């Protein structure tokens, strides 16, 4: 469960306030006009944007003052944040070991995650050698191996065409269901939100 309590973010003249609860395993679409603060909200929940006041609870634990990697949250940004000099296996492996010194069991986890998103056989390729859709799949695989209870996605598929974007959204929901995870995903398409997600949060 995610609880955002009396949250306030202040950035120069911009102010964002939020107060809501999301039950475990819900799939939430975050909608709102450009500049409303959708990315800021996810960044604040994930620990990347400082709070002026308020609290964030993940499964009953107050994570407001903890580092992003200690919150039980994984976040997928708009550009996917893949490192161009690393292979897809290495990029996904960063979700488990920032040093990439993985055990055999962890290497198998990475392999299974790449298989899950349809990238078996692409393990040794670098991001520049695959399509935009395949890059999005690799970024999703990195989120998958982290096995966090809360997944935040900041318009991760906005650069893709409608058909591929829909495919990636369906894959994301499938991954979330398999992991019993709660997801919040920013989208500009109300049809996507209505078709594939449980609730809509307007910012």
Each model region followed by its residue ranges:
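Helix-to-loop junction immediately C-terminal to a conserved catalytic motif
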Residues: 46
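Conserved ABC ATPase "signature" region
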Residues: 104-122, 173-174
């Amino acid at each position: 469960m995610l609880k955002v309590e009396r949250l306030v973010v202040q950035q120069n003249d911009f102010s964002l306030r939020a107060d809501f609860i999301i039950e475990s395993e819900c799939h939430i679409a975050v909608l709102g006009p450009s500049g409303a603060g959708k990315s800021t909200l996810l960044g604040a929940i994930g620990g990347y944007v400082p709070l002026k006041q308020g609290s964030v609870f993940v499964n009953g634990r107050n994570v407001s003052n903890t580092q992003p990697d200690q919150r039980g949250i994984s976040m997928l940004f708009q550009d996917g944040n893949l490192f161009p000099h690393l292979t897809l296996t290495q990029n996904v492996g960063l979700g488990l070991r920032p040093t990439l010194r993985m055990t055999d069991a962890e290497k198998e986890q990475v392999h299974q995650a790449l298989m899950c998103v349809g990238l078996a056989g692409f393990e040794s390729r670098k991001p520049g050698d695959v399509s935009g859709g395949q890059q999005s799949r690799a970024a999703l695989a990195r989120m998958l191996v982290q096995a966090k209870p809360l997944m935040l996605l900041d318009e991760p598929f906005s650069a893709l065409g409608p058909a591929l974007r829909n495919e990636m959204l369906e894959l994301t929901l499938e991954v979330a269901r398999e992991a019993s995870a709660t997801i919040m995903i920013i989208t500009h398409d109300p049809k996507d939100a209505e078709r594939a997600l449980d609730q809509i949060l307007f910012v």
